[in-house]
């Protein structure tokens, strides 16, 4: 039986093997939208594979079902994880459908690590490729992600797979963003840190010389964040409302980059306030915008354009914008510079 201890009973027989181990005994009508593996029935094995990414069973087609891992970065061999490995479910942990474990980093396979053009980010090339960061705390994981150990020049280095379905920043990197402005040794103010999933990877990227100030308002997520920070000396957790930067001004020094993923209607203002307090002139910002959080009635494109206009008024000069398809719907990432020095 799979990890969660229940087994949704659909109509008809036919035992499908869902990714994360939901045995989905349903036949016929495919796995529910939540992506419990659809049975062997005619249905779309696992209806889009659900963003939870427990891959559809051996059923036909469905965007995440039997027909091979979808578009994502690490899909399983035979009907692997949801829209490409493992969606938010965490790197397709269960063996996807018929195939082997989604991810292809089973022992014995030769995995080579290449540096990504963003310093501190790497690509693991194996049976399937994945985005990885060098683990700051070897031997421990943060949210159940896969770890890969590679031996170079006699020393073992451990990397953690960075899942674009769980992290907006990873989605932006895989989407081809030009700059993330977080080289090793830089100081980053991270607004909307949640449980510390992405924060842990930023901590990997900036490395032992860098610092991540992680601001999160929710006490529930804050507890997880503090637990992540206990092991990672370069994360400073701040459980405070990002709307009131003066409350944590004693904790935060000047930073090189602000990353914001706050999903609030006034997030442009939140970033501007924090930039005025902590961002050095010529420093950069990376903002993840969720259109439906700002105006759920307008077209996403119109929302993004309006936000960019607001930023310009606050001396935040956007330099690039890209949407996060296929990893997130109606999300965009805007990267830019704060108070750029006048051109000579």
From Swiss-Prot:
Q: Which GO terms describe its molecular function?
A: histone H2AQ104 methyltransferase activity; RNA binding; rRNA methyltransferase activity
Record's protein name: rRNA 2'-O-methyltransferase fibrillarin
Note one Pfam family from the annotation. Answer: Fibrillarin
What biological function has been recorded for the protein in this entry? S-adenosyl-L-methionine-dependent methyltransferase that has the ability to methylate both RNAs and proteins. Involved in pre-rRNA processing. Utilizes the methyl donor S-adenosyl-L-methionine to catalyze the site-specific 2'-hydroxyl methylation of ribose moieties in pre-ribosomal RNA. Site specificity is provided by a guide RNA that base pairs with the substrate. Methylation occurs at a characteristic distance from the sequence involved in base pairing with the guide RNA.
- UniProt modified residues of type Asymmetric dimethylarginine: 9, 23, 25, 40, 42, 48, 51, 58, 63, 71, 77, 83, 88, 93, 98
Reactions that this protein is recorded to catalyse: L-glutaminyl-[histone H2A] + S-adenosyl-L-methionine = N(5)-methyl-L-glutaminyl-[histone H2A] + S-adenosyl-L-homocysteine + H(+)
Q: Which Gene3D superfamilies does this entry report, sorted A to Z?
A: Phosphorylase Kinase, domain 1 (3.30.200.20), Vaccinia Virus protein VP39 (3.40.50.150)
Where does this one sit in the cell?
Nucleus, Nucleolus
Quote the cellular component terms of the Gene Ontology held in the record.
box C/D methylation guide snoRNP complex; Cajal body; dense fibrillar component; nucleolus; small-subunit processome
**Region Disordered: start-end pairs:** 1-113
Look up the EC number in the record and give it: 2.1.1.-
- Species source reads Drosophila melanogaster
Provide one Gene Ontology biological process annotation.
box C/D sno(s)RNA 3'-end processing
User: Could you tell me where the Gly residues compositional bias lies?
Assistant: 8-107
PROSITE patterns in the record, alphabetically?
A: FIBRILLARIN
Q: Which residues bind S-adenosyl-L-methionine?
A: 197-198, 216-217, 241-242, 261-264
The protein's PTM annotation reads: By homology to other fibrillarins, some or all of the N-terminal domain arginines are modified to asymmetric dimethylarginine (DMA).
The UniProt similarity line reads: Belongs to the methyltransferase superfamily. Fibrillarin family.
Cross-referenced HAMAP family: RNA_methyltransf_FlpA
How this chain assembles, per its entry, is:
Component of box C/D small nucleolar ribonucleoprotein (snoRNP) particles. It is associated with the U3, U8 and U13 small nuclear RNAs.
Superkingdom to which the source organism belongs: Eukaryota
Which key words are in the record?
A: Methylation, Methyltransferase, Nucleus, Ribonucleoprotein, RNA-binding, rRNA processing, S-adenosyl-L-methionine, Transferase
């Amino acid at each position: 039986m799979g990890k969660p201890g229940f087994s949704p009973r659909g109509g008809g027989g036919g035992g499908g093997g869902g990714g994360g181990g939901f045995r989905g005994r349903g036949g016929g009508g495919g796995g529910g939208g939540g992506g419990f593996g659809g049975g062997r029935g005619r249905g779309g094995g696992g209806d889009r594979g659900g963003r939870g990414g427990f891959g559809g069973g051996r059923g036909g087609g469905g965007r995440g079902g039997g027909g091979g891992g979808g578009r994502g970065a690490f899909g399983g061999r035979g009907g692997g994880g949801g829209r490409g490995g493992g969606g938010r479910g965490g790197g397709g942990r269960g063996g996807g459908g018929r195939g082997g474990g989604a991810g292809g980093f089973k022992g014995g396979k030769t995995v080579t690590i290449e540096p990504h053009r963003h310093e501190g980010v790497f690509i693991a090339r194996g049976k399937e490729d994945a985005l990885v960061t060098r683990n700051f705390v070897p031997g421990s994981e943060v949210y159940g992600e896969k770890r890969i150990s590679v031996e170079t020049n006699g020393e073992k280095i451990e990397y953690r797979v960075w899942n674009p379905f769980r992290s907006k920043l990873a989605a932006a990197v895989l989407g081809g963003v030009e700059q993330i402005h977080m080289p090793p040794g830089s100081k980053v103010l991270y607004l909307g840190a949640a449980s510390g999933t992405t924060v842990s990877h930023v901590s990997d990227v900036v490395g032992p010389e860098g610092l991540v100030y992680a601001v999160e308002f929710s006490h529930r997520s804050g507890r997880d964040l503090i637990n992540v920070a206990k092991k990672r000396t370069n994360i400073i957790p701040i459980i405070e409302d990002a709307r009131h930067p003066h409350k944590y001004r004693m904790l935060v020094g000047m930073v090189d980059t602000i990353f914001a993923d706050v999903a609030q209607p006034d997030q442009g203002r939140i970033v501007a306030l924090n930039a005025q307090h902590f961002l050095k002139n010529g420093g950069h910002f990376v903002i993840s915008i969720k259109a439906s959080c700002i105006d759920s009635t307008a077209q996403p494109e119109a929302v993004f354009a309006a936000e960019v206009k607001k930023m310009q008024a606050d001396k935040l000069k956007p330099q690039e914008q890209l949407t996060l398809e296929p990893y997130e719907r109606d999300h965009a990432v805007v990267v830019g510079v704060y108070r750029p020095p006048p051109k000579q």
